């Protein structure tokens, strides 16, 4: 499809999802392949009830995993034995292709470096947490131990970033194809970032536990050392 056809298709999806809600478009984040807007119920305050709606078609989920999804309402009704209501409203479980967690991990790893060098890391500190937590997962450890698979997917991630970042106004100091080399931009993990990281549990995490910034630094040092060992 052409870019204009993509834009029209995404607009139809956006209109369907936002039907019955008030909407404020985020023009700086809208183009033919991406639509961003804040939406909120007509009888509620925008300041307290708005949700950011993001719809995009820039990147294919590669590699992907097929996952089943159902609404919380359907799950609740089934738990309460109200199958007649589920049937009445034709609530169904759907299967969707989702980005495999290994690619999600690498996307997060690369985005932290990009935001650090481009000066936007203070707004993306949650990414540091995501990388640190994902690194502890057994499936991520298995992935990192598979050198051939890691090199292949890291190459794909870098090349994809390079292609799409050409269309965005980012710092020329960031090279998406370059070596990870955490030691060259570690200075951006400064006191400001530490302070925000150690207070994430107050508003952004599903835990009340204060996070260790030292553990986060160690995670990125480990990742950088591993990437260096495979020439990345």
Model-derived features: where do they sit?
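Structured mid-to-C-terminal alpha-helical surface segments
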Residues: 2-232
């Amino acid at each position: 499809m052409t870019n204009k056809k993509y834009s029209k298709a995404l607009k139809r999806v956006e209109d369907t999802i936002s039907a019955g809600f008030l909407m404020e478009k985020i023009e700086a984040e809208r183009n033919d392949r991406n639509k961003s807007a804040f939406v909120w119920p007509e009888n509620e305050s925008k300041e307290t009830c708005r949700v950011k709606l993001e719809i995009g078609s820039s990147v294919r989920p590669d590699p992907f995993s097929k996952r089943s999804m159902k609404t919380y309402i359907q799950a609740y009704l089934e738990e309460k034995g109200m199958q007649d209501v589920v049937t009445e409203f034709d609530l169904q479980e759907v299967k969707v292709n989702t980005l495999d967690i290994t690619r999600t991990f690498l996307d997060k790893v690369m985005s932290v470096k990009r935001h650090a060098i481009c000066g936007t890391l203070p707004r993306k500190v949650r990414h540091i947490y995501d990388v640190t937590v994902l690194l502890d997962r057994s499936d991520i450890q298995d992935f990192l131990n598979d050198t051939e698979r890691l090199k292949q997917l890291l190459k794909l991630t870098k090349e994809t970033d390079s292609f799409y970042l050409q269309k965005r106004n980012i710092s020329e100091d960031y090279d998406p194809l370059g070596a990870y080399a955490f030691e060259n931009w570690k200075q951006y993990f400064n006191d400001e970032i530490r302070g925000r990281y150690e207070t994430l549990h107050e508003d952004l995490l599903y835990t009340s536990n204060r996070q260790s910034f030292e553990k986060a630094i160690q995670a990125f040092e480990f990742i950088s050392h591993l990437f260096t060992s495979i020439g990345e």
